[in-house]
C-alpha cells in the first residue's frame, strides 16, 4: 500500500505550506514550530485561540479560529492528530482537492528521517524524560532538535530547532501512530493498560511496543525500565540491542537510596556494579529519579561525560504542569500537576507526602469518560496519600458521556474504598470557593488533571489573598 507522504516538501521548503488541523494541540504545535524555524510556511486552525497559537502567529504562522474548508488556502499537505474527526470540513476539503492528509506522527517521522533520533515512549514520564534527554544533550554541546509533549520551562516552549543531526522526540502510543517513527535510540519508561479504546487489550498494546522497539536500526539501542512488569515481559521479543534500568539488581543501570527533600530528589546510580555517584533533580517524586536514570543510561551509551550529565540534571528546570508551584498565600502552597492516570496520581501524591510532610489537599478533575470508566477500580485507591480530596466533573475532551463514569461516581467509589474525606463539586469553577473553608495554614494544595483544572490554582490564590482563612 502506498502511503500519502510529501517527500517533495523537504526539497522545496520555502515554497511549501503545511496546514495543521488542531494547531493549538501540544503535540501539533511543536512540529509546527520546528517547521517554521526550518523556513516552511505554516498555517493552522483550532476551535479557539490560545497562548500556543498566539506564539506561533508571532513566529510567522497563519491561524484560523474554527474549522472551515476555506482555511486551506494554498496548503501542500494537511497534518491531523488522532483527535480530528474524518468529517472535519478541512479534512474533507483536502481529500476532495487531492491534498495529502497525514497523521502528526508521520510528519514527525519525516523530520526524523535524516536525523539520529532519540524517541521516548511509555504510559507515563514521556514528557519529563524527553525534556531531560534534550537538556543533557544540549549541555554536552550536541545541540539537538527537540519536540516535546509539554512546555519546557527553560525554553518556554515545547520545541527547539538545533543545528546538529541529533533529534529528541516524545513518541505518543495512544493511537498507535508512534509506529511511524524509526528512532536510533528508543526509551520505554513503563506500560500500563491504557488507550484500550484503540488497542482492545494489554497484549495488543505490548505488541505495539515490541514493534516500536524493533524499529531501531542494528546500530541502535533500546533503554527499557525493568521495574515495570509489562515492560519486562517484552524482553524475550526484543530483537534489537537493549539495556535495562531500574531498582532491580538485574538492571544494567540501577538506582538506590532515593531521598526526597522538598523540591529536590536525590539518588545513587550504578552501571552494573560500578558506582556512578549521586545525582539530583529539582523535581518531586521517586518516579522522577527513574526518569533521570533512563537519561543517564542514554548518556552513558552515547559517551557523554558523567559530570556533564550530573550537572545538567541538577540544573534541569522541569516541565510546566509537572508539580509546578503556582504560588503561596497565607502559608498555603498551591501546586499544579498534569497527572490524570491512577499510576501518575499515586506517584505524585506519594512524592508530595514524602517530600513535604504536610497536609495534602487535592482537587482532581477526571480526564475523558473512557479513562474514568476503564480505570475506575484503579482510581479508587490512588488518593490514599491525600488528606482531603475534592473531585469535580469529568473533562470530556470531546467524548460522549458514559453512564457510571462520572465525577460523582468516582468520588463515591473512592469514599466507599475507605477515604474519609471526599467531596464532589460539580462545576470546576466552584472549586476555589469550596476549597477555601477547608484549608489551614501549612497545607499543600495540589490540582490534578489534564483538563482545565489548571485554572483552579490561580483562582484559589486570588481568593486566598483577599479572604482570611477560617479560624479553627
Curated annotation (Swiss-Prot):
<dbReference type="Pfam" id="PF02875">
    <property type="entry name" value="Mur_ligase_C"/>
</dbReference>
<dbReference type="GO" id="GO:0005737">
    <property type="term" value="C:cytoplasm"/>
</dbReference>
<dbReference type="InterPro" id="IPR000713">
    <property type="entry name" value="Mur_ligase_N"/>
</dbReference>
<dbReference type="GO" id="GO:0071555">
    <property type="term" value="P:cell wall organization"/>
</dbReference>
<dbReference type="GO" id="GO:0008763">
    <property type="term" value="F:UDP-N-acetylmuramate-L-alanine ligase activity"/>
</dbReference>
<dbReference type="Pfam" id="PF01225">
    <property type="entry name" value="Mur_ligase"/>
</dbReference>
<keyword id="KW-0573">Peptidoglycan synthesis</keyword>
<dbReference type="InterPro" id="IPR005758">
    <property type="entry name" value="UDP-N-AcMur_Ala_ligase_MurC"/>
</dbReference>
<keyword id="KW-0963">Cytoplasm</keyword>
<dbReference type="InterPro" id="IPR004101">
    <property type="entry name" value="Mur_ligase_C"/>
</dbReference>
<comment type="pathway">
    <text>Cell wall biogenesis; peptidoglycan biosynthesis.</text>
</comment>
<dbReference type="InterPro" id="IPR036615">
    <property type="entry name" value="Mur_ligase_C_dom_sf"/>
</dbReference>
<keyword id="KW-0131">Cell cycle</keyword>
<protein>
    <recommendedName>
        <fullName>UDP-N-acetylmuramate--L-alanine ligase</fullName>
        <ecNumber>6.3.2.8</ecNumber>
    </recommendedName>
</protein>
<dbReference type="GO" id="GO:0009252">
    <property type="term" value="P:peptidoglycan biosynthetic process"/>
</dbReference>
<feature type="binding site">
    <location>
        <begin position="122"/>
        <end position="128"/>
    </location>
    <ligand>
        <name>ATP</name>
    </ligand>
</feature>
<dbReference type="InterPro" id="IPR036565">
    <property type="entry name" value="Mur-like_cat_sf"/>
</dbReference>
<comment type="function">
    <text>Cell wall formation.</text>
</comment>
<dbReference type="GO" id="GO:0008360">
    <property type="term" value="P:regulation of cell shape"/>
</dbReference>
<comment type="similarity">
    <text>Belongs to the MurCDEF family.</text>
</comment>
<dbReference type="GO" id="GO:0051301">
    <property type="term" value="P:cell division"/>
</dbReference>
<dbReference type="InterPro" id="IPR013221">
    <property type="entry name" value="Mur_ligase_cen"/>
</dbReference>
<keyword id="KW-0436">Ligase</keyword>
<keyword id="KW-0547">Nucleotide-binding</keyword>
<dbReference type="GO" id="GO:0005524">
    <property type="term" value="F:ATP binding"/>
</dbReference>
<keyword id="KW-0067">ATP-binding</keyword>
<keyword id="KW-0133">Cell shape</keyword>
<dbReference type="Pfam" id="PF08245">
    <property type="entry name" value="Mur_ligase_M"/>
</dbReference>
<dbReference type="InterPro" id="IPR050061">
    <property type="entry name" value="MurCDEF_pg_biosynth"/>
</dbReference>
<keyword id="KW-0961">Cell wall biogenesis/degradation</keyword>
<keyword id="KW-0132">Cell division</keyword>
